[in-house]
């Protein structure tokens, strides 16, 4: 058993405390049982214990809940070591650690006392009041669209809490609240995904949320609300703006997540986050925020070809499944995609295993089917780099998953749900069909183009028209290349040397009689007959006399 010392010199052991203080019970933190406990000392809470109740008979092992099982010692040792190194690096935390040893009751807070010479006066621009932009009825209508379209996939809000916040906000319309950026983000996304003409104040709602969020980045009181609002902004920008804007927003989200300590499990939060950690929310909400933020930042970074934000000391557990949303399915898909990190040196078998895991996912929401398809197309691009010879079975599976995504994209377009992959999957799928360049893959080009044109009719935007023109030009280039190849083959058959006419006639007859052609010499083939070119390319044809240098193999 490993022994560690806490900030006050106590010896910590891997034993569960026999009692917990009221503060740790209320905030669902692991208490070490000391009076005062280490958690309350760090965050300067009042530490009180209730009198010991009469001891009850010990419950059997079979009745213990899974959540009460001891954490893996190796995992805890790794997290502890990481936190100790981070706290040792931190000059802002050291005065607190020193004070804890000298006087635990009067230790200074974790704060950048000598961070610089002091802040300058900064004028505070007033924000646009949310209640001046839209009415309560409009807010409730937009929130209903948000809960119907966005919430099932990215469930970072509690619907009941959201409705209560709306009522409270319009009950006191003159007073701004820290929840306002969330309400602005919900309203903007509700407008975007409503399926109707956008709300006339959608742009103003987006701008208002942006102004408030950019202020909170430099404020001293960063809250979990701000991380939620940054996630909503990232989703909005991923749906409507350029890759750089959504990537920057997703990176800012991750930095806010770190500032509030949401990347660490509440039981293992580090001292270095004590000045900004938000301990006012339940553990499950915190876990959902961290994982959704990580999914968005990682996938946007992969698709954009940029670096993702990697946080140190991550100990946040995945959230539990919940009725009414599919966020845990999204996270499961992300955990498969972690193998595609550019720093991973995957073997061909690793990528094929990842494809099998993607195939086994059973998804019921079209937005998730789009992500599943996108993941399969990404695996294909990695396979092209890993190997020049991809099996036909793998190609068939890639095409099937791509076609599933194409059908989901059409359904979402008909439903007027502008998920970003509605445009991306048809475009990328067509590119990959052309790259595979087999008769099977090319047979899907026509239906895929028709689907892309139908989506463009639903969303007649300049971006989609440009994408459609681009893919049509690539199809024409592929067609022109094949026509040039066909012309070369046709011309080669029409060029004859008069001196070799008689010899050619004899050779032709010999080829008709050759055993490797079997009975196909005089066979009239239908126009759509598909030669197995691999048979020809792998067959040893004696172009030279068998007696001269043993012949050559043509490839």
UniProtKB/Swiss-Prot annotation:
InterPro entries listed in its UniProt record: Metabolite_Synth_Reg (IPR052478), Transcription_factor_dom_fun (IPR007219), Zn2-C6_fun-type_DNA-bd_sf (IPR036864), Zn2Cys6_DnaBD (IPR001138)
CDD domains linked to this entry: fungal_TF_MHR, GAL4
Primary residence: nucleus
Span list, region Disordered: 51-73
GO BP term (any one): kojic acid biosynthetic process
Compartments it resides in: Nucleus
A single MF term (Gene Ontology): zinc ion binding
Protein name per UniProt: Transcription factor kojR
Organism listed in the record: Aspergillus oryzae (strain ATCC 42149 / RIB 40) (Yellow koji mold)
Lineage: Eukaryota, Fungi, Dikarya, Ascomycota, Pezizomycotina
Gene that specifies this protein: kojR
């Amino acid at each position: 058993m490993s022994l560690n010392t806490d900030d006050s010199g106590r010896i910590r052991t891997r034993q569960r405390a026999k009692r917990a203080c009221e503060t740790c019970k209320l905030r669902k933190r692991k208490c070490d049982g000391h009076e005062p406990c280490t958690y309350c000392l760090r965050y300067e809470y009042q530490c009180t214990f209730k009198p010991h109740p009469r001891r009850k008979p010990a419950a059997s092992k079979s009745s213990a809940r899974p959540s009460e099982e001891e954490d893996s010692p190796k995992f805890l040792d790794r997290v502890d070591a990481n936190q100790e190194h981070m706290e040792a690096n931190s000059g802002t935390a050291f005065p607190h650690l020193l004070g804890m040893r000298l006087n635990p009751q009067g230790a200074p807070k974790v704060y950048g006392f000598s961070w610089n010479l002091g802040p300058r006066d900064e004028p505070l621009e007033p924000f646009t009041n949310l209640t001046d932009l839209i009415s309560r009825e409009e807010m409730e209508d937009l929130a209903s669209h948000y809960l119907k379209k966005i919430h099932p996939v990215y469930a970072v809000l509690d619907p009941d809490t959201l409705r209560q916040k709306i009522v409270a906000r319009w009950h006191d319309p003159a007073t701004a609240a820290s929840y306002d950026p969330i309400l602005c983000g919900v309203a903007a996304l509700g407008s975007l995904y409503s399926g109707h003409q956008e709300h006339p104040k959608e742009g103003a709602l987006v701008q208002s949320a942006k102004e408030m969020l950019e202020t909170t980045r430099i404020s001293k009181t960063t809250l979990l609300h701000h991380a939620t609002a940054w996630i909503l902004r990232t989703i909005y920008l991923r749906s409507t703006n350029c890759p750089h804007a959504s990537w920057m927003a997703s990176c800012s989200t991750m930095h806010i997540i770190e500032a509030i300590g949401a990347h660490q499990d509440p039981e293992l939060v580090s001292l270095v986050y004590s000045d900004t950690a938000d301990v006012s929310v339940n553990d499950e909400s915190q876990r959902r925020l961290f994982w959704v933020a990580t999914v968005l930042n990682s996938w946007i970074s992969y698709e954009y070809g940029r670096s993702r934000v990697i946080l140190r000391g991550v100990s946040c557990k995945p959230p539990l499944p919940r009725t009414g949303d599919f966020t845990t399915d999204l996270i499961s898909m992300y955990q498969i995609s972690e193998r595609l990190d550019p720093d991973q040196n995957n073997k061909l078998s690793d990528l094929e295993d990842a494809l099998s895991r993607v195939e086994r996912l059973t998804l019921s929401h079209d937005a998730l089917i789009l992500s599943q398809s996108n993941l399969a197309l990404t695996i294909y691009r990695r396979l092209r780099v890993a190997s020049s010879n991809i099996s036909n079975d793998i190609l068939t599976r890639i095409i099937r998953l791509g076609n599933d995504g194409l059908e989901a994209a059409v359904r979402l377009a008909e439903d007027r749900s502008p998920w970003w992959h509605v445009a991306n999957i048809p475009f990328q799928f067509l590119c990959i069909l052309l790259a595979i360049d087999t008769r099977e893959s090319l047979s899907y080009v026509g239906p895929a183009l028709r689907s892309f044109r139908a989506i463009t009719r639903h969303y007649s935007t300049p971006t989609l028209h440009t994408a459609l023109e681009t893919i049509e030009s690539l199809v024409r280039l592929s067609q022109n290349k094949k026509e040039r190849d066909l012309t070369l083959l046709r011309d080669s058959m029409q060029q004859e040397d008069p001196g070799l006419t008689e010899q050619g006639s004899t050779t032709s007859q010999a080829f008709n009689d050759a055993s490797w052609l079997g009975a196909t010499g005089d066979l009239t083939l239908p126009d759509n007959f598909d030669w197995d070119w691999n048979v020809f390319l792998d067959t040893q044809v004696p172009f030279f006399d068998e007696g001269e240098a043993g012949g050559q193999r043509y490839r």
